[in-house]
């Protein structure tokens, strides 16, 4: 019998993306300490955080397949996580203005059927933003719970000029790659 799937994330965006697969799942989240070390390579940092989330839930539910994920925005190798306040959010958007950065989403899958890890990088380029553009964007979008202070799926056309790679990855879960891993463990949608 295929174990039940648990998404170890409270992100509504990850829930919506995983729902697209057709695989039934529940959501269980445990608090974990997220690293924000700028000295670690982006994929390694994201994988560490994703694994911590998956393993915290898997310890309590060892008969389930647990999916943990972590998304970070990196500008010139420096991580931009979720802002602490609105001024930090404005500062992040100013830094990203007119520049290309990377979004890394790492996924850790823990299951009695096996263990999988993956990290996907997507390149995102911002338009040149004025202070008025930044203010208007922040009025429309709750930037406080978003890595890099923006959401691709929420008025992204206002601030983003191009994306090279998986747009689902920018939103928070590289669905195609996750499905390949789940298929490898025997899951079918």
From Swiss-Prot:
GO molecular function: dTTP diphosphatase activity; UTP diphosphatase activity
Positions bearing the site annotation: Important for substrate specificity: 13, 71, 153
GO biological process: nucleotide metabolic process
E.C. number(s) listed in UniProt: 3.6.1.9
Chief location category: cytoplasm
Subcellular location per the Swiss-Prot or TrEMBL entry: Cytoplasm
A single GO cellular-component term on record: cytoplasm
Catalytic reactions of this protein: dTTP + H2O = dTMP + diphosphate + H(+); UTP + H2O = UMP + diphosphate + H(+)
Originating organism: Akkermansia muciniphila (strain ATCC BAA-835 / DSM 22959 / JCM 33894 / BCRC 81048 / CCUG 64013 / CIP 107961 / Muc)
Keywords in alphabetical order: Cytoplasm, Hydrolase, Nucleotide metabolism
Reported cofactor(s): a divalent metal cation
Family according to the record: Belongs to the Maf family. YhdE subfamily.
Active-site positions on this chain: 70
A family per Pfam: Maf
Free-text function comment from the UniProt entry: Nucleoside triphosphate pyrophosphatase that hydrolyzes dTTP and UTP. May have a dual role in cell division arrest and in preventing the incorporation of modified nucleotides into cellular nucleic acids.
Protein name stated in the entry: dTTP/UTP pyrophosphatase
């Amino acid at each position: 019998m295929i174990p039940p799937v648990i998404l170890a994330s409270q992100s509504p965006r990850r829930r919506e993306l995983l729902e697209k697969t057709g695989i039934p799942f529940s959501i269980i989240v445990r608090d974990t300490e997220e690293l924000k070390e700028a000295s670690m390579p982006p994929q390694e940092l994201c994988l560490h955080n994703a694994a911590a989330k998956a393993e915290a839930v898997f310890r309590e539910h060892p008969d389930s397949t647990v999916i943990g994920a972590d998304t970070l925005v990196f500008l010139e190798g420096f991580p931009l996580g979720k802002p602490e306040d609105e001024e930090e959010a404005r500062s992040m958007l100013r830094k990203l203005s007119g520049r290309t950065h990377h979004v890394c989403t790492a996924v850790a899958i823990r299951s009695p059927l096996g263990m999988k890890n993956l990290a996907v990088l997507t390149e995102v380029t911002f338009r040149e933003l004025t202070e008025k553009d930044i203010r208007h964007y922040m009025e429309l979008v709750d930037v406080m719970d978003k890595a890099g202070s923006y959401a691709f799926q929420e008025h992204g056309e206002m601030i983003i000029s191009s994306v090279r790679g998986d747009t689902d990855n920018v939103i928070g879960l590289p669905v195609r790659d996750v499905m390949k891993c789940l298929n490898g463990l025997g899951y079918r949608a």
